[in-house]
Amino acid sequence: MTKTKQEIYNKRPTSPHLTIYKPQISSTLSILHRMTGVALFFAVSILAWWFILSKFDSNYIKLANCCCIIKICLILTSFAWFYHLCNGIRHLFWDIGLGFSIKAVNLTGWSVVICSVLFTILLWV
């Protein structure tokens, strides 16, 4: 490149970096929906395997009652389940063309998070 072309190349605008990007509720929930989908795949696979093992040895059930880490994993799995369910219902409304305004997207997004937390609390209390 000639000197002028290099100067022009260096002065061209670049896209904003992730450090200055402010995440929006819709983008955050979209990423969370994908993460919970992957997490549920693994969690349900492990739970199925665990239930099969508990059929032959009851110590696996006792382990779940006494181990805090397993209980925390089960609570997080139930939150992921409820979040994925509530957000899936939200997507069904989008499929029929409802709730596309910015206000509706933000309102339903926060509603999904609040309902997921409430359903998880109701399940475990």
From Swiss-Prot:
InterPro entries, per database record: SQR/QFR_C/D, Succ_DH_cyt_bsu_CS, Succ_DH_cytb556, SuccDH_FuR_B_TM-su
Compartments, as annotated in UniProt: Cell inner membrane
Membrane protein topology class: Multi-pass membrane protein
Disulfide bonds: none
Lineage top rank: taxon: Bacteria
Sequence intervals crossing the membrane: 30-55, 69-89, 105-125
Pathway where it operates: Carbohydrate metabolism; tricarboxylic acid cycle
SUPFAM superfamilies found in the cross-reference section: Fumarate reductase respiratory complex transmembrane subunits
Cytoplasmic side of membrane: 1-29, 90-104
Residues reported to bind heme: 84
Single GO MF annotation: electron transfer activity
Cofactor comment: The heme is bound between the two transmembrane subunits.
Cofactors, names only: heme
Keyword Glycoprotein: no
CDD domains: SQR_TypeC_SdhC
Alphabetized UniProt keyword annotations: Cell inner membrane, Cell membrane, Electron transport, Heme, Iron, Membrane, Metal-binding, Transmembrane, Transmembrane helix, Transport, Tricarboxylic acid cycle
Periplasmic topological domain: 56-68
Gene Ontology BP terms: tricarboxylic acid cycle
GO CC terms: plasma membrane
Purpose: Membrane-anchoring subunit of succinate dehydrogenase (SDH).
Recorded family membership: Belongs to the cytochrome b560 family.
UniProt name for this protein: Succinate dehydrogenase cytochrome b556 subunit
